[in-house]
Structures are given as C-alpha cells and as structure tokens.
Amino acid sequence: TVWFNAVLRGDVHFIKIGNRVNIQDGSCLHTLYGKAPIIIGDDVTVGHNVTLHGCEVKSGALIGMGSTILDHAVVGHGAIVAAGALVLKNTVIGDGELWGGVPARFIKKVDPEQAKELNVGYAQHYVMYSDWYRRSDAHPNTHITAPHRKNMTKLPNGNTSTREIMRKF
C-alpha cells in the first residue's frame, strides 16, 4: 500500500515493489538517473516521512520513520533501520542487522525470529489497515470507526499488538 502524500518518482529509472509492502505517509522514493533503481522486496515497512533514493531494501526489512537511505545502499533481509537514521551511499546493511544514527552505524544483530515477528507484523498490520480503509464503511473526512480489536489481523505470534515485540529490543 502507498499511503497519503507519499511520492514514488520512477521518472529516471524504475521502481520495483514486492508484495505486502507499505509505504507510509509522506515518504519519497526517487531513483538515480540511469544508474540506480529502487528495489523493495516482500513484507517491507517504509515508515512515515522516509526518503529512499536509488537503493535496495530486501524482504522483511523495516525502515524507521524519518530515515534516509541514499544511492546504491542495500538494506538486508530482516534488517532494521532506526527512525531518523541516515544511511550513506554504498552502505551495505547485513541481514538481520539494526542500524541507526547520523550517519547510520551498525548497532547490533537482531534475533531472526524477533526481527521477523516485528517486521512482518508491521507489514501485516498495514495490509489490514488498507483492507479496512477500502471497506465501504470507511470514508475519508468522515467519522471512521476503527476495526474492533477482536477483528484485527493477528501477528505471527498470535498477538494483536506490537508492544510486546518492541519490549524485546
């Protein structure tokens, strides 16, 4: 899903987006003229106000709010880029690694099960949000009733909240 005010500029190279990807509000994806497309794998969350520029984000990754990933950078499978991070050009973030800061640096390896639970969980939540939003009883600029908790999509561990997962970090 591509949310409000997100911009995908594939004007000078292509953008390829996998399944169950959510690109949240205000994010900007732009390619590098003739040199660097944007490639995003499956089950990826791109947080609010993220800038992706000519980079690759592999399946199961989570890109935190307000972060920037520059040309030719690669974010590995199940990796996490912390909110507000600046990933410099040509940086390679390994599978299952947590990076953060300005400029972004390696922080730690994340347990693969925890990363999958968190990253895929967020992706699944946004699939649910898009289904809910498209329903006939949800309309913009009117009173919208949120889905009842009992009807929410379950995370892989059976939880309906990511709070428990975040406590593990």
Predicted regions located by residue number:
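N-terminal first-folded block
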Residues: 1, 5-9, 35
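Glycine-rich hexapeptide-repeat left-handed beta-helix
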Residues: 11, 17-19, 25-40, 48-166
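Short proline/glycine- and basic residue-enriched helix-capping loop/turn segments at helix->loop/beta transitions
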Residues: 45
